[in-house]
Each structure stands twice: as structure tokens, then as C-alpha cells.
A protein has these predicted regions:
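N-terminal chloroplast transit peptides
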Residues: 1-34, 44
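A hydrophobic C-terminal alpha-helical subdomain
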Residues: 47, 298-382
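Oxidoreductase cofactor-interface core, primarily capturing Rossmann-like NAD(P)-dependent enzymes
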Residues: 47-109, 120-132, 142-148, 161-169, ...
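Cofactor-binding loops of NAD(P)H-dependent oxidoreductases
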Residues: 117
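Hydrophobic beta-strand segment of the Class I
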Residues: 135
Length: 382
């Protein structure tokens, strides 16, 4: 069996097994979570005393505050924006971070608290969930990590822990149209996690994302300014990009509003763009001409098929499968009318791509002018 096929078969088997488990969890509802919580005795980080769980707090007359929040993946591009926004709105934010020699001090500097845990070691998770009302899961595998271990197995463990600890709301970030492209391992895992959440017994909110504006700086804006070659595609795929700060704003709106509970919503920017249009916008704002090398979609398909034959390249094949979808001419966009109503927001509150890139180029060009054009553009990001 080829590596990718083996990967999918294993995932289907695991999903079937875990779905059977969570079906029983879902039918018994919150009562099952309470029973599981009583079985999970969490040792406090100081003094060795048994720490009360979220359910224990509620039954003892000290209900968990609605403003208590755990952010998973808090050091990532999106996670840190969620932390910052939540703190600004008065939430008591706890961040789950990986054990490391140099912890994320900036999170504590902002006013959040941190707790160390390893997503791949479920036994380390429960202490992070004590006294928490809402979990926002912004974690995802890094390029060097095993996506299956982080984006599927760890997600199952995290959701099981949250349900057992009596978490009231679980917010999960998914990918737009993941249900339509399950041939792509990452999108298949995102869809499977969505289904897993539905039977967890918790209130949930799934936010499907189209694309972030932030990567466009390194991918297109900087190469245009530095007159470096960049890669494009000859397809008509369009993406409605969002600033991660706006995603954070929408996330907190979803947490506040009961109307967003137990819903799957797609978050999209005001307008969708093709790669060619993004490059043209960077050229216009940067006052330079881009050196573009287009990659034919056919080459992506061939490369993906070729890499399947090698065990060491299965991860590369997975990424190429995702790239193939991105270059297939589909539209990652959504009508946000009903979503804005649900969130109590309006389109005027969302940054457009033109505004975002214009702010970047105005700052970088001003800085370059001040230093005589000798600095490297890549040192300056919004």
C-alpha cells in the first residue's frame, strides 16, 4: 500500500473507533463529562493537593467565570492575536504552551498566565483546563512535525479532556470547504475533528477560515520590494483573505454570543483575490515590477503522484495535495451576511486587503527612505 493510502486507511480506522467512543459521550451529554471529571484527579502544580475541576467548582457553589479562557496554540500567528484581543476585552486568559527552555514570556507580559503541557501526551493536559469556561483551539502542526499526531490524535485527546473537565464552549478553527476535499489529508482531518466535536457533549463553535493576509507579506510583498523572484500559478483560484486581528475579533464575538453556539461558520474577507491580483496590488503599492515564475497546475499533480512512491516524502505529498487544491481554480470565499448578523458585526469593521497592504508598504517605504534605502525590507512587518 502506498504511504498516502496507508495514511488515509489508518485515519479512517482511528476515526471510526473514536467516533464510537464519542457517540456514547454525546448521548449521555454533560453527565458523562461530570463522571469522567470525578475520575480525573488533577494534582495541583504547587503543594501536591488535588485541584478542583471545572465541574467541581460549579457543584461546590463557585461556578467557573464566563470570562475564564484557555487558548491552545497561543504563540502562533492567530493564537497570539486571540490572546491579545481577549485580554483587551477583559477576559482572564490562560495559555497552554509547550515545555521549553525559553517560555513565551511575551504572553505573561501582556497579562496572560501560562501552563505547560504537551498535546501529544494527554496525561499532561487536565491541569490546564481547571477552572476554564471556554477553550479556543488555534493549534496546528508545524512544518517539521507530524500533522497526523497534532491535527488529529492530539485534537481527539484535547476534546476528550475538555469534555471530561466540563468545558462550556470549545472553539475550533477549520478550513473552508474541508468537507468537499477530503482527499487532502489535512482537510480530511479538519473535517473529522468537526464531526468529533459534534458528538462531544460540549457546546462548540467551528470557524472555517479561507486565508490569512499575514503570509502575503513574506510571500509577495517582500519579494516585490527586494526584486526577488516569486512563485505564482496559472490558475483562477480566489481567496477572501482576512487579517488575523479581524479573525480574533470575530472569535471573541462568537464566544460572547449564544447564537454562535453549535454552529459551523465560514469566515471570509470582503473580497476574494487571485494570486495574479495580489501580485499586481503589491506591484502598484510598492512601485516595483515583480519577477514571477508561474507553476503549472499539471506539474503540481505530477509531483504529488511521484512523491507518493517514497516513504520519506509522504509529508511532502500531503502538502502538495493541499497545494493542488489551492491551485485548482476554486473559490475560498463566503457570503458573510448571516455570519455578521450572528456575530453582531458589520463588514465595515473588517480590514480589506488593500488597506492591509497599503499600511505595510507605506510604513516600509517610509522607513527605507529614512535610512537611505540600505535596510533589509524583511526586518519590518506589521
Amino acid at each position: 500500500m502506498q504511504p498516502l493510502a496507508m495514511h488515509r486507511a489508518t485515519m479512517r480506522e482511528t476515526f471510526a473507533r473514536t467516533r464510537r467512543t464519542t457517540t456514547s459521550m454525546g448521548t449521555s451529554g454533560k453527565a458523562t463529562g461530570r463522571r469522567a471529571t470525578r475520575a480525573v484527579r488533577v494534582r495541583a502544580e504547587s503543594g501536591g493537593e488535588s485541584a478542583p475541576t471545572s465541574e467541581d467548582a460549579a457543584t461546590s457553589g463557585t461556578p467557573v467565570r464566563k470570562t475564564s479562557m484557555l487558548v491552545i496554540g497561543a504563540t502562533g500567528t492567530l493564537g497570539r492575536q486571540v490572546v491579545r484581543r481577549a485580554l483587551d476585552e477583559g477576559y482572564d486568559v490562560r495559555c497552554l504552551v509547550r515545555p521549553r527552555q525559553n517560555p513565551a514570556d511575551f504572553l505573561r507580559d501582556w497579562g496572560a498566565t501560562t501552563v505547560s503541557a504537551d498535546l501529544t501526551k494527554p496525561e499532561t493536559l487536565p491541569p490546564a483546563f481547571v477552572g476554564v469556561h471556554t477553550v479556543i483551539d488555534a493549534s496546528t502542526a508545524r512544518p517539521e512535525e507530524d500533522s497526523y499526531a497534532i491535527d488529529w490524535e492530539a485534537k481527539c485527546a484535547t476534546i476528550q479532556t475538555a469534555a471530561a473537565m466540563g468545558i462550556s464552549r470549545y472553539v475550533f478553527y477549520s478550513i473552508d470547504q474541508c468537507d468537499k476535499h477530503r482527499e487532502v489529508p489535512l482537510m480530511n482531518m479538519k473535517y473529522a475533528v468537526e464531526e468529533y466535536l459534534k458528538v462531544s457533549g460540549m457546546d462548540y463553535t467551528v470557524l472555517r477560515l479561507c486565508g490569512f493576509m499575514q503570509p502575503l507579506i513574506a510571500g509577495y510583498a517582500v519579494p516585490v520590494l527586494e526584486e526577488q523572484p516569486l512563485w505564482g500559478t496559472d490558475d483562477d483560484t480566489r481567496t477572501a483573505y482576512l487579517d488575523t486581528q479581524d479573525v480574533a475579533k470575530m472569535t471573541l464575538a462568537a464566544v460572547r454570543r449564544d447564537e454562535a453556539a453549535n454552529k459551523i461558520m465560514t469566515l471570509a474577507g470582503p473580497k476574494s483575490y487571485s494570486v495574479r491580483e495580489v501580485i499586481a496590488l503589491c506591484e502598484k503599492l510598492g512601485g516595483a515590477e515583480a519577477k514571477v515564475s508561474n507553476v503549472p497546475v499539471g506539474l503540481l499533480k505530477f509531483t504529488r503522484a511521484f512523491t507518493r512512491f517514497f516513504q520519506w516524502s509522504s509529508a511532502a505529498s500531503d502538502r502538495l495535495a493541499f497545494a493542488e487544491v489551492l491551485a485548482s481554480g476554486i473559490k475560498f470565499e463566503a457570503d458573510m451576511t448571516e455570519t455578521y448578523k450572528t456575530l453582531g458585526m458589520s463588514e465595515d469593521e473588517v480590514t480589506t486587503l488593500e488597506q492591509y497592504l497599503e499600511e505595510y508598504f507605506s510604513k516600509i517605504l517610509k522607513k527605507l527612505k529614512e535610512v537611505g534605502g540600505e535596510s533589509r525590507q524583511r526586518d519590518f512587518y506589521l
